[in-house]
Amino acid sequence: MRRFLFVAAVCTLIALPLAAQNTDIESLSGLQFNFGNPGARSLGMGGAFLGLADDASAAEANPAGLTILRKPEITLEGRNYQEQQVFTTSGTFPDLKRTGFSHYSQRIDATFASIVYPTKHFTFGAYYHEPLRNEGTGQVVPIRNDFTGQIKTDVPNFFLPVDANGNATGGPISAAACNKLRQTNPFACIEYTVLPFLSSVKVQEKTLGVAVAFQVGKFSFGAAARSQRFNETAFTFRVTPTGDFSSISVQATSDIRSNNDIAKDKTDLTFTGGFKWAPNDKFSAGGVYKQGAKFAAPTFAATENTNFEYVKVADTTFHIPDVYGLGVSFRPIPVLTINADAVRVKYSNLVDNFVSINATVRAIDKAYKAADALELHLGGEYFFSTKIPFAVRAGYWRDPQHSITYTGPITNSDEVGPAILFPKTKNQNHMSVGGGLAWPRFQIDFAYDRSDLFKVGSISMVTRF
């Protein structure tokens, strides 16, 4: 016997919390944030910059570093990226196949700009930063033969042993074990498949910030206030195996229940604070805390039960993770700088008071988790003292897995579905290279960072007055 699983679709629209934290729309499961420090110079050194923080990008990276600047300075950066979001597309639980769907920028986008002005006692800065931009679509559908139309790769499935009433008596079993049960009782095991779906996300966060820093002896302290603007639309559209509409689930930053409605921007005010200690010209250390913004992003759904009209499921909130980190910088010789950072990203903020669209899963306490990540960054810069000095840079950083993961029980079909679609992912190792040319009042830097799932190129310019 084969049944189709209404994974993550609306089972009921009652008894929901008035407010909750995020939801289980597939395109949000592995969302890639850009918590790295801005600037091609930092990117080329594996993002290790907190202990150095010696140019205008420090306004966002670590505002305490602004005190090292003695002249007004302007920075502009553009980035181009390509990333892959991975969905479970086929296989039998737990032996599943995952496929990457590429998201990329169509052009070089302006992702950071800052202006810094030092005075006798304070250094002031103002900046623009784009820490999050993601737009793309993935699908889990049967793959058919181009000539015969027959399915050659089906959507993910699993098998459950059941009693005489069709209730599961245990967790998923293999196809072979299911066939063995059916030899004595044809109805002792049921095969389930997920419904085909398409899931898409379009999300962007923009930041306008002002920073101030001052120095006391060998210590510098800085802070920034950030007005953060956020826009999001994420949805999953499900169909039946015959291609008929089944359900649609949507999270957006405003009410989008009318056909012509477009998600509107939400804003929040957050703060950052940092310090830097530079006992001599060979060593410095710094630290920073960045508060994550919170944005109202309600969740809606439409099914046959709602007469295919959108109904609000919950007033969910999108909480950008908090970030805090420490870094050191060492200059053994004047032309060589070595940096190391440790950055803690609280991805668990994404699932605080999480609400599932599936009623069965919603009843499970803390069914979803997102692991906090400790990013380790290491990089270096070497300057060649030529007529036009130029630098070469290289770095490495480790991005631990932090996707939204289903960790609840798997004793019935509604619970196995999320385990298939929201699995634990892999750590990512990033390698970066970069370079730059420096004139007395102008500097241009470029860098490239890559991992298995993410690639980004950057070019930035600095001018001093």
Where are these regions (language model features)?
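N-terminal signal peptide c-region/cleavage motif recognized by signal peptidases
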Residues: 15-17
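Outer-membrane beta-barrel porins/channels
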Residues: 21-43, 110-112, 116-465
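Outer-membrane beta-barrel translocator/receptor signature
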Residues: 40, 52-61, 67-151, 205
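Short structured motifs
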Residues: 61-62, 364
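Bacterial N-terminal signal peptides that target proteins for export
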Residues: 1-6
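Repetitive helical segments and hydrophobic/amphipathic motifs
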Residues: 11-12, 71
